[in-house]
Amino acid sequence: MNDTFSLLQKYTGISKYSKSEVITPQWVVSDMVDLLPQEIFNPDATFFDPAVKSGRFLIEIYNRLMASGLMKQAFPNEQDRHKHIIEKQLFGFATSPTAATVVRKTLYDNPLSTGNIRFTSDKLTKELIQGAFNNMKFDVVIGNPPYNKGMDIDFINLGFELSTKYCVMITPAKWQTAEDNQRIASKMTYGQFRKKIVPHMSNVVFYPDCKDVFDIYQCDGICYYLIDSNNIYDKCKVTNISYNRSYINRVETRSILNRESLWNIGNEIVEYLGDTSKIEMQTGENCRYHVMTNSQLSGYDWFIPEGPRYCLAVSVIVDTKNGESWSGLKTLSFGSDDIKECESFISYINTRFVRFLVAITLSGEIGLPTSNTFRFVPAPPSGKFDHIYTDDELYKDFNLPQKYIDVIEAVVKERK
């Protein structure tokens, strides 16, 4: 079964019904449904989308049910199987009358039939849903809740409370890093959400750059996840993906409360480097040459929505004896009478490796470079600035695993 909304997109150019709506791409819908265990696609399971827009979640589930061996065993006749699925297994609450009509036309032989796709108000509440479906609960709740006004965690909680087995949602990833007592317009604080919902998460897929999924801006990235209503997990499988490349090249299972993010991966790299001696800034106040930079430093919030960033502004060498202007520049506290040493220093701090370690000290800040900015940056293995450094050289010298190299090169822009 193909969704009618895709045909509307193809022939009319409509991408969504209103400016506030975010339509989930089909490939993401498929990936989200993949999180569910195969045994859930059986004749007794019920599936509910609490925020139906395109209908893609319900249509994807319909296709999985039609192809399920358990369903074919119970309903060998294809028409009987179809009838059972649309009458007994698929339920949805639409975000608008238009969305309801489009999805009904896709699912039902009679597009005017209400079926199990309801719309009574655009103000979605637990009471409204229970009233529309006679206090029914569902084995699986899946969808893309509204993001406006920071109410997404309330919708996740709603899905959790309406599900008897699993809840699969795609939402902004702010819940990973927000302060415990923070709330925007939601009833829950992020701390309450993490305490109640996060222990039930068994699988999280995180996109730090929202534009890898949606054509919208979300400064905290986007994630989708499987919530197991009946089980609590000490650890959770977490996958970070950017530009269609996985940060984790093997299955990683860890505590979700670690707030899996580039900050955590940065900490892993720092721990991996261990007690290597750190770079020391030569103030060189009386030296002829000074390495200078402007004040624009950008931390790791960066990478969203614009993708890789430089993280450290361009540095220049100022010849103090020639009276060159320092206007608009701030010192990096490095000086030398040997211009070649300054050039070597600049090549070192311009590597992606060093700029990544600078970025994780900033944690989203923008400000002036200080000696603290470089606190995670190791000194060159030789201890000298005597040649032009490259990333390949440093990766080899510090024996950096490929999984960390992939992270660095995905989020820090090459400087040419």
Task: Tell me what each language-model feature is.
Residues 1-213, 219-234, 238:
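SAM-dependent methyltransferase catalytic region
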Residues 411:
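Short acidic/histidine-centered micro-motifs embedded in hydrophobic/aromatic stretches
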Residues 15, 19, 27, 202-203, ...:
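C-terminal substrate-recognition regions of SAM-dependent nucleic acid methyltransferases
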